[in-house]
Amino acid sequence: MASKKKQKILVTGGLGFIGSHVVVKLINEGHDVAIIDKKTDYGIIDKKELDAVMQERFFGIANRITDKINLNIYTIDVANPELKTLFEKEKFDSVIHLASFPRQKVVNADPVEGSKVMSEGLLNLLELSRQTNVGRFTYISSSMVYGDFTDNVEEWEDCNPQGQYAIMKYAGELLVQDYTRQYGLDHTIIRPSAVYGPLDVCDRVIS
């Protein structure tokens, strides 16, 4: 276990591709981890394949953690106001927000539903984090906030989001930053680019 102080951490989208790897890392560092995941296929894969992927990710988590623990998984929408009960009960030290529509074509197909997850859900989590004194909020954005780029980009370069997915991700960054300005909520923003690997769904690689 690392020498870091043990924390109680909420990972939204913790059964997703990236989230499942994050959960394993945190648990193996000795942190207490809870997962929120709505287990939605977003029309990318059918239910049978989704169930298989979720099972693979769950057992992937269970098999890669060094100490066997009770892992709390909550199947609930991040925009649901009832999350307040969970936040008040658990008093999380940190929130890592990965839950989102997974890619641009899914948001384009249903932008209204996309905004509920990517905007309303984020705002709900930020407000609950403020109300329960969460120490740090980590927001997983996207490299798509830079717009079309052909070479490597640095984090300080100008953003030019194009398309509803990228715009909502960038708007999310501004919301997170505003909660720091107004309420002192410490934050980290991460902009992953072209992430792939074990436990991802196959269509991302071949599409």
Walk through the language-model features, giving the residues of each.
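Glycine/proline-rich active-site loop of Rossmann-fold NAD(P)-dependent oxidoreductases
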Residues: Y170, T188, V195-S207
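N-terminal Rossmann-like NAD(P)+-binding domain of SDR-like oxidoreductases, especially those catalyzing
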Residues: M1-S193
